[in-house]
Swiss-Prot record:
Signal peptide range: none
Pfam families, alphabetized: UPF0262
InterPro entries: UCP032146 (IPR008321)
Protein name according to UniProt: UPF0262 protein Rsph17025_0594
Family of this protein: Belongs to the UPF0262 family.
Length: 158
């Protein structure tokens, strides 16, 4: 079964996330564990490692780290992605989320909906960038990429 069965976010920041960010993290983890598609491609002529997988996401030395383990917690892979390609879309996502969180408190539903549509568009762009960066390292569907992108943003926020 090629899926993520457990996920951890290795946050090094001593500053706790805001209530909104913590809520985003919890929802993304719940949704990800409910339904996802995550597979490792074959390497060096060996057959692909089958899931389910335990995944830890971290930022170390300025790089996004995917630490992948078997369900029995044996290491099956690790790869590092440059954060450069994510910087602008993460920044844009931060800004639109701040606008959205403020809008929910004080604006009418029609204006909230417009901001939410923009937020979803930026979120989709982040998922697209992540899918591109994962090419040859891991295979994910767009919904899994969206949820992982949310967790990458949480790492930045934290």
């Amino acid at each position: 079964m090629n899926r993520i069965c457990h996920i951890e976010i290795d946050q090094a920041s001593p500053i706790p996330p805001t209530a909104e960010i913590e809520q985003e993290r919890q929802v993304a983890i719940f949704d990800l564990l409910e339904e996802n598609s995550f597979a490792l491609p074959p390497r060096e002529g060996k057959p692909p490692v089958e899931g389910p997988f335990r995944l830890t996401l971290a930022i170390r030395e300025g790089r996004l780290v995917f630490d992948i383990r078997s369900q029995e917690d044996e290491k099956v892979g690790e790869f590092h992605l440059s954060l450069g390609p994510f910087r602008q879309v993460v920044k844009d996502y931060f800004q639109i989320c701040e606008s959205y969180f403020e809008a929910v408190k004080r604006l009418p539903p029609s204006q909230i909906e417009a901001i939410d549509m923009a937020r979803r568009g930026i979120h989709n762009e982040g998922a697209r960038v992540l899918k591109e960066r994962l090419e040859g390292k891991a295979e994910v569907d767009i919904d899994t990429a969206r949820r992982l992108f949310t967790l990458i943003c949480v790492l930045h926020w934290g």
